[in-house]
């Protein structure tokens, strides 16, 4: 019999909701703590910049047990995603489990000798308290604390009326109207904000980035939805993955010329479609060498605006501020009223005790997580949403279903600590030696190996999987409804008080 646990889920974003639902559905008592005043994570209205929308199509950016409304466009806007998440929480009875405006300051092993953790919590009114939990699901993900970039001269820049803000704080399009906007970064949020600033009437818009990267348009060649290219098993199998034998390696070697030609063809198409040479934004890196979770979607209008000068593109980074001017690393000087730092988020779990931090993160920043979910040296704890991908919600959903069974000892393939550590060592070597591109974000990215990752999780859970037409399945994106059917075949159980 599985004993009921009191589970603390840290974070009420996409991953936290998945974890809360998974543990509650198995009979556990769940408390979800969220430092902000609303659910949604990056989709919380206070954090979402104007015109933000999903990079993934709606049939992929969803939970297995709830589709997005048919009325939504293929790539839903921020308010629509937030409404979907709110409805998901409500439909699974999670509203009563949420505690907003509550930050986890620290955690330590329980003093009463029982399994679990004691969390020190602080609310926005300054009140603090300690609470014991039997299990902790960390769902803060990779987009938690905004990165900062302290530079000389920034106080003088602000004193003259300049504004410096992280992209997550660019919440009002009117902010740009009639002003000089400089955006630092090469991510989709950077190009989204640059385009929004132009459309909002900014007097000048400049985007600053180190090197151009490959961006994928929503429709490759203007015709083919990119999900038919990036999200299919056939594409994934062009990359040699971990744990393959001699026969599979030989097959990859034989197919290498065809795979090479495939990528060169895609590069040529992107150069023509996006006019990369005209924009002087042809990447140096081969496209296949950089396929990971950082591959951005091309913001509609971005390249045309660069081509006609509405957006000025500068290579480099900020060096310092000089009055109302930003001086770049290459010496260029750009006048600015607003500096938007689209430089991402800090990766880490700051409330974890130092001795456990060392067990979680390698000296080179790589995370030690089995299936990107659990570490045998961090007992009574797991991570959801640290298996980032092109289909984030589906990844979080499957990870949450895996984690609750792992916590309850109910996986069909329940791993031993030795098995977990051996697998972690193998995956670390794969990221460092065989595919360095897999090491981005601390190695917390399953792209382009979505299907292999999902296959491993389902096999561990003990689901029955069947494919009516394996050939068709090889050329179609992941089907969330199919994964719901697979999960329904796993052994059922309920925790008891």
Spans of features found by a protein language model:
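Flavin (primarily FAD) cofactor-binding/catalytic cores of flavoenzymes
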Residues: 2-51, 55, 67, 72-219, ...
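N-terminal glycine-rich dinucleotide-binding loop that anchors FAD/FMN and/or NAD(P) in oxidoreductases
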Residues: 47-69, 226-237
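Non-catalytic, mobile gating and regulatory segments of ester bond hydrolases
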Residues: 165, 425-431
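Compositionally biased, charge-rich terminal segments
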Residues: 205-253, 429-437, 447
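Short, well-structured alpha-helical segments that form the helix of a local strand-helix-strand
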Residues: 419-424
């Amino acid at each position: 019999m599985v004993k009921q646990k009191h589970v603390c889920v840290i974070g009420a974003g996409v991953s936290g909701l998945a974890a809360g639902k998974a543990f509650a559905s198995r009979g556990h008592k769940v408390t979800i703590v969220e430092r902000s005043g609303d659910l949604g994570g990056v989709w919380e209205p206070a954090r979402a910049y104007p015109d933000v929308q999903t990079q993934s199509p709606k049939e992929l950016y969803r939970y297995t047990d709830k589709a997005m409304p048919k009325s939504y466009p293929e790539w839903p806007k921020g308010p629509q995603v937030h409404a979907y998440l709110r409805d998901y929480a409500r439909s699974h009875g999670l509203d009563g489990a949420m505690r907003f405006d509550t930050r986890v300051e620290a955690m330590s092993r329980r003093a009463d000798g029982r399994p679990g953790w004691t969390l020190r919590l602080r609310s926005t009114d300054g009140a603090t308290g300690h609470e014991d939990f039997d299990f902790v699901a960390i769902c803060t993900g990779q987009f938690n604390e905004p990165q900062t970039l302290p530079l000389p001269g920034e106080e003088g820049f602000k004193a003259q009326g300049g504004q410096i803000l992280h992209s997550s704080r660019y919440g009002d399009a009117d902010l740009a109207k009639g002003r000089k906007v400089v955006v630092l970064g090469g991510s989709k949020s950077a190009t989204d904000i640059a385009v929004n600033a132009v459309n909002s009437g900014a007097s000048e818009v400049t985007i600053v980035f180190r090197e151009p990267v490959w961006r994928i348009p929503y429709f490759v060649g203007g015709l083919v939805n990119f999900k038919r290219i990036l999200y299919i098993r056939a594409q994934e199998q062009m990359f040699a993955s971990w744990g393959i034998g001699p026969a599979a390696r030989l097959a990859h070697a034989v197919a290498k010329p065809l795979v090479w030609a495939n990528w060169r063809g895609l590069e040529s198409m992107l150069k023509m479609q996006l006019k990369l040479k005209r924009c002087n934004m042809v990447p140096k890196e081969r496209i296949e060498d950089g396929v990971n979770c950082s591959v951005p979607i091309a913001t509609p209008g971005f390249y045309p605006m660069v081509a006609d000068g509405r957006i000025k593109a500068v290579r480099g980074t900020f060096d310092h501020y000089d009055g109302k001017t930003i001086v770049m690393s290459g010496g260029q000087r750009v006048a600015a009223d607003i500096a938007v730092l689209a430089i991402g988020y800090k990766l880490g779990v700051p409330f974890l005790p130092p001795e456990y931090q060392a067990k979680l993160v390698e000296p080179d920043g790589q995370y030690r997580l089995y299936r990107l979910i659990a570490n045998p040296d961090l007992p009574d704890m797991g991570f959801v949403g640290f298996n980032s991908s092109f289909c984030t919600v589906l990844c979080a959903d499957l990870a949450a279903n895996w984690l609750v069974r792992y916590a309850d000892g109910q996986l069909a393939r329940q791993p031993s600590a030795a098995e977990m550590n051996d697998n972690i060592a193998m995956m670390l070597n794969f990221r460092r030696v065989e595919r360095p591109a897999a090491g981005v974000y601390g190695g917390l990215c399953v792209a382009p190996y979505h299907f292999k990752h999902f296959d491993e999780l389902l096999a561990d859970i003990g689901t029955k999987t069947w494919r009516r037409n394996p050939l068709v399945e090889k050329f179609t994106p992941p089907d969330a409804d199919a994964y719901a059917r697979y999960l329904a075949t796993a052994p059922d159980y309920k925790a008891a008080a």
